[in-house]
Amino acid sequence: MRCFFLYIFCLALSVSCLAQETIVIKRRLTDVVTERITVLKSDINIKQGLYQAVIGKNIALATGNYDHNKRTGVWHFFNPHGVLIQNFDYTHNHLTYEALDTSSIFHYAIYAPDQDSIAKKDPAAIRIIRPIRIGGKYYGYIPYLRLFRRPKDLYDIDTDRFLVTIELLISPLGRLAEYNVRLRFLGFEKVYHIDINQLSDDDKTFIPATLNGKPIMCQISINCFMSNDGQIDFD
């Protein structure tokens, strides 16, 4: 009888292992970024195991693990040169590391009704913390870059002549409230309002800006360029 139960246990274990068998698939995220995704062999729509986003063959942008399509544990995010810029613990929903912000293409404008009154009382008492995009300053913003391509009515203009600015309005709750792309060319200027419903819930989530510890609204503006194929990107 004991042998029988042992046989049943081993059989169940083998079936379980078979059900969890995984494979790695590759998917192009942008022109230069490729995803390597571990998925269930029985259902490639379920991410299970190691995830990597890389530039070229070996420059990592993001690495972490999935458990049935849910990000788990600590994920690591890098800049395009492979330098670590952020760690985020998805299991405990906690930012564990954020590199010093030295970028000159990101600009922030805060909206705080009581900012002026605080400044008049004690300017040194103002402490502002910028909003943080989970995923870092490159990988985390890829979903927004992918939503815009050069409009057909502007095909006759060289892409390198455009001045492109992404404008993201982040609520005090850390939610993306509005996304605009501003194009400038000589005397021409037009703002394109992007439908944020195309984004996943994760792609609309930020750690909000704060003023003296109080969450506030903030607009992130990013200076970008337009590639020859009409996509927007930034260095």
Q: Where are these predicted regions, by residue range?
A:
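Bacterial Sec-dependent N-terminal signal peptides
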Residues: 1-26, 235
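Charge-biased low-complexity segments
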Residues: 21-235
